Amino acid sequence: MSRRQRGVALLIVMLMLSLMVTIAASITERSGKAWQRTSNLLNRTQARWYALGAEALISNVLQRDAQASPESTFIGQPWSKVDHQMMADGTEIRAQALDGQACLNLNALSPARNVTPNNASGNNTSGNNNAANGSSGNGNSPQPPKVGTSEQVPYAAQVFRQLMIVLGEDPKQAERITDALRDWLDEDSEPLMNGAEDDSYVNFHPGNQRMTDVTELRAVMGMDAALYRRLLPYVCVLPVDKLAINVNTLMPGSAPLLSALFMGDISLDMAERILQQRPPQGWRNLNDFMGMSALPESGKNGARQVLVIKSDWFFADIQIRVDDSEFYQRSLFHRGKQIEVVQRQYGGYRTVNP
């Protein structure tokens, strides 16, 4: 074999070797990715079942609390405690229940028309119970009409506007955002005085229906990122259009919401002190709360429409860690005669917890 032929043969061998190495590397990479995908799928499936187990446990706790205290819901009951568990296989479970009525339900800003009012919390209580609580649970009684219109402003919308003002927003801008949000929720395409319908949005239309997630608030005309973040701890979305806020589960950090419920007639410091002075098992009825000397008479009529001492809507934030994988789930419970899970959300869904 000539020298030239030996060189060609060596070149062919090197080419074949490089091709074999490339193929082997590709097979190894694909096998590794397939193994990783399988591992992730198994971890996710395992985490999901753990989350459903945590959800069932929270459901049982809510049911027991309702049986132990059928007329009131307050901080200090078992449902309000964070549960942190380490399983035998190394899985870490963290679950926390949150009162869905310790926040302002955005869907209450545009209640359905010509509908007989019901208790917003979903309670099937009698008139006597409502009288004892001092509230019918309906947060949308007619209010004085807005200037220049015949539209009656729901009390929840007034609270939302006042909440933005308490958080430092300009009153005129707060009015515009409130009307824009009401237009987002209502079924028609007629804008309110300061509202926004189809013509105000580019490339998409307002929902014209109830919100299903609080993140929709970011898309409302006039809502910027800074205000959105400030509002997040105090607002939520429930699948009802009534407002009922439980004074027994408001934390001192919710002072801006309490101040807004009284239209700013109580300062943030005073609202925080009121919540700090709450009895260990909450106020026995709404009249005990309303009888506090620190509360201004001017705001009691409005606040009485929406304040309650019993909750029937709860969120559960569940975090599962399996090996290096993390799984997040938020469940929404409705507590009536039975505990029902009405919604589940997966993954990171917001930047601030309520």
UniProtKB/Swiss-Prot annotation:
Residues 114-151 are annotated as: Disordered. One of its GO terms (biological process) is protein secretion. Disulfide bonds: none annotated. The keyword Isomerase does not apply. Residues 29-354 are periplasmic. It comes from the Bacteria. The keyword Cell membrane applies. Keywords: Cell inner membrane, Cell membrane, Membrane, Protein transport, Transmembrane, Transmembrane helix, Transport. The chain crosses the membrane at residues 8-28. GO terms for cellular component: plasma membrane. It holds the Pfam family T2SSK_1st. InterPro entries: GspK, GspK_central_sf, Pilin-like, T2SSK_SAM-like_1st, T2SSK_SAM-like_2nd. Residues 1-7 form a propeptide. Cleaved by prepilin peptidase. It is found in: Cell inner membrane. Its main location: membrane. Residues 118-141 have a biased composition (Low complexity). Belongs to the GSP K family. Type II secretion is composed of four main components: the outer membrane complex, the inner membrane complex, the cytoplasmic secretion ATPase and the periplasm-spanning pseudopilus. Interacts with core component OutG. Component of the type II secretion system required for the energy-dependent secretion of extracellular factors such as proteases and toxins from the periplasm. Plays a role in pseudopilus assembly and seems to control its length. Interacts with the pseudopilus tip complex that is critical for the recognition and binding of secretion substrates. NCBIfam families: T2SS_GspK. PANTHER family: TYPE II SECRETION SYSTEM PROTEIN K, TYPE II SECRETION SYSTEM PROTEIN K-RELATED. This is Type II secretion system protein K. The lineage of its organism: Bacteria, Pseudomonadati, Pseudomonadota, Gammaproteobacteria, Enterobacterales.
